[in-house]
Every structure is written in structure tokens, then in C-alpha cells.
């Protein structure tokens, strides 16, 4: 799933609406709960100003991902939009345990 900036998105900084900041915190907490439940094992925030805000890998059908993301507080508030791209992986694929800050997509 590719998370993108929605019409109500704003970059972090002193001019960001406090309501947007709260929505993004709720979105992040929800993502961590989805990870803990095994539904979204890989979460990759992107903050390069490109309009792409993140990439996540779900362990769910595209239909289930659509339902899950439709309930996301950031999506509901128009802060984010998303695209679903069904994919597959190789058994055992995972992120390295080393410094996650060095990964590039």
C-alpha cells in the first residue's frame, strides 16, 4: 500500500495545523497496532516532500486492506490517500535488523 498526501495534508513545521498533527499521531498509533496484530508487518514512513508519505506491506487481501485503510483517521480526515498494489514476496523476506535509517526504496 502506498500512502500519499491528501488534500488536507501539510508538512511538519511551525505552520502545521495542530489538528493535522493529532490526526497523524492517531494514524501512527493505529499503524503500530496493526503491526502488533500481524496485519501490517512492514511500515516505512517517507518524508522526502514527494507527496508519497509511506509504504506499507499488509498480510491481507486487497479487499481487506481497502476496508482497513478506509477506517484510518488520516484517510477519513483527507490528510492521506492511498493506493493498493497487490504483490508477493519470497519466503523469509524481511527488513534487516540494522539501522533502518539507511534503507532506500
What are these regions (language model features)?
Residues 1-105:
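Conserved, structured core segments of small domains
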Amino acid at each position: 500500500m502506498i500512502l500519499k498526501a491528501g488534500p488536507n495534508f501539510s508538512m511538519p513545521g511551525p505552520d502545521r495545523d495542530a489538528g493535522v498533527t493529532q490526526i497523524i499521531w492517531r494514524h501512527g498509533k493505529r499503524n503500530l497496532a496493526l503491526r502488533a496484530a500481524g496485519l501490517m508487518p512492514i511500515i516505512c514512513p517517507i518524508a522526502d516532500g514527494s507527496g508519497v508519505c509511506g509504504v506499507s506491506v499488509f498480510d491481507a487481501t486487497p479487499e481487506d486492506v481497502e476496508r482497513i485503510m478506509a477506517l484510518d483517521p488520516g484517510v477519513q480526515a483527507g490528510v492521506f490517500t492511498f493506493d493498493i498494489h497487490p504483490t508477493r514476496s519470497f519466503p523469509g523476506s524481511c527488513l534487516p535488523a540494522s539501522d533502518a535509517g539507511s534503507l532506500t526504496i
